[in-house]
């Protein structure tokens, strides 16, 4: 009979749940292994077939590690705050909490149907007050450490969108919201900010401590953007007490500076704009406020700008340089001011060409007739730097600046502090009170969690504040002395819960602390973290930042949270495009589980190709995987679903070599997460097993253990058919005998007069005389030696017989 996946999979899922098979308890006498998936956002669409790929990979590792004697922590939870739930609630009038919980229930059912070995007792949900109590508590530690502060930040403000709201850079196109096409303006708004820049160097340096893809490390380094250079001070003409500070990585080009550019929002713009240029500057500032940072810094964008009417003095040669404003300079980067060297920077070159500003050559032999030159060479027109290369000239100029109090060496970062507030309802409340006397205080720790109030009115306030500003009985507070204050109405971003959730899994029911020292010391760090490459920068950077803060506070034992990171590839539609509802190419795993079973889906997704590569969904491949599942079943089970008689204790040795080869290769490939090649070897073993009359039970048990991480339901059923009463989960992983891998036969090449005439199989280490006789007796060789005089025979044992015949 065929393998009945519906009955067998339900049977074993019920068994695992009833027996809490995958429950992880702290056991200091046992080595641990912590395998973690990036927890999902529980969307209304439910799982698609891309989710199980990463989940199956961590499950294979978890199941193998348990069998290798490790105490495995393998949890699952929900990153459940998010804008889609709020938008759905606004559209339908339903509460986002109810919508989210319904989605979580659906996700959980789908995940459980796939047989993953999660410890469900450790499930976390970022929207649960018992969880976000500790998100708020960590925020309070950041605040006490001076790492959380309020600041006026330029944001994208859409006054006509959703009643007036802030939108992200990615939601802006051509000065309008992508959804609805509402006008967007740049305006300063009070925001909470986390000082991630204080950890910039450590976030770069500690990448050396982890086993991550080099591409991800490089993306993080580039995002942080550490650059060494100098700050240069340019005194303003007519007001020498006012100086414009500029950061440059090329202090050696100071002699080539021909103008200075300020961002339109830079704090000195109004002060430096002369009356005759005021109208023009104000108009330009208003136009710039309609563009996002992404649009403004597009290298292909036509350069725009206006002159302020003021000048600065170049400290190195006393030249007057005009001060312009242009939107290609951002107030949020560096000091919001740049010294423009058109001969060495293409953006400056384009700007200078458009506005007819001087372009001064400073590198000998550089052709600047068509564009800027940023290569090395000897300096010219550069005073005391003439004749020096770039490296030497940089250092000499920095020395000069420091000696003349005109500047100093400086390290700058592309990384900006993390804007941590959102003008939304559906997020963690920030535990802060603003008192009428102008002071700010944290909600006392013993009053946490500060719960999100229930309200039917989650419409944007229209003022830029979050909808929480509308909940007056929640917002207004009084202390014991009658002092009035207002609660912070901004909420935390969705990144907050995911910046520490892996720590909560180690001790999820602790009401006294986010996790006990004992649990953290035992389970930390995460040994394997698997998720999509789209989180290569922000989530991983924020998580590392919070972890390092907690490390500095003595609350976690490791500098880094995730030791090994793997990014699984994307499962594309059969048309090689990304799966999406709009393209109609989404495959629902529920349908696959119903038709073929979870083991088939798991097998297929691990066999599609290397885990890190993106591959298209292929129904033929899925059908082929199911055929192999049935083939494995028939190998061991007869038509009455009983173990075949040829599975016995008799071992004639015919499978010994291939069995040991399979144990070795599958173990090594699983460890390297090369699941597709491990499955190929399992297929080789099954093919060989079908060729023999007797199936030694010890080999069959070992084989079933090896398929258990990928096909756990079938493996459990087959294990029970061997008469075993315990789950296969904790059975010892099979080992191989190195002696059985030794080749007992070799292929010898036979050459006659330098040309290969035959390849002969013979026993390994056959002596020279016998090898010579076998070679000369070979029928094909004799065609080239008959009637000839054998002058010489050279034998290289186990490799070659070389015959010289005349």
From Swiss-Prot:
GO-annotated cellular components: cytosol
Span of the annotated motif 'HIGH' region: 40-51
Record keywords: Aminoacyl-tRNA synthetase, ATP-binding, Cytoplasm, Ligase, Nucleotide-binding, Protein biosynthesis
One Gene Ontology biological process: leucyl-tRNA aminoacylation
Location within or outside the cell: Cytoplasm
Main location: cytoplasm
Gene Ontology MF term list: aminoacyl-tRNA deacylase activity; ATP binding; leucine-tRNA ligase activity
Keyword Thylakoid: no
Record keyword Lyase present: no
Enzyme Commission no: 6.1.1.4
Short sequence motif 'KMSKS' region: positions: 578-582
Catalysed reactions, as listed in the record: tRNA(Leu) + L-leucine + ATP = L-leucyl-tRNA(Leu) + AMP + diphosphate
Binding site for ATP: 581
Stored InterPro entries: aa-tRNA-synth_I_CS, aa-tRNA-synth_Ia, Leu-tRNA-ligase, Leu_tRNA-synth_edit, M/V/L/I-tRNA-synth_anticd-bd, Methionyl/Leucyl_tRNA_Synth, Rossmann-like_a/b/a_fold, tRNAsynth_Ia_anticodon-bd
NCBIfam families the UniProt entry points to: leuS_bact
PANTHER family from the UniProt entry: LEUCINE--TRNA LIGASE, MITOCHONDRIAL (PTHR43740:SF2), LEUCYL-TRNA SYNTHETASE (PTHR43740)
Family, similarity comment: Belongs to the class-I aminoacyl-tRNA synthetase family.
Protein name (record): Leucine--tRNA ligase
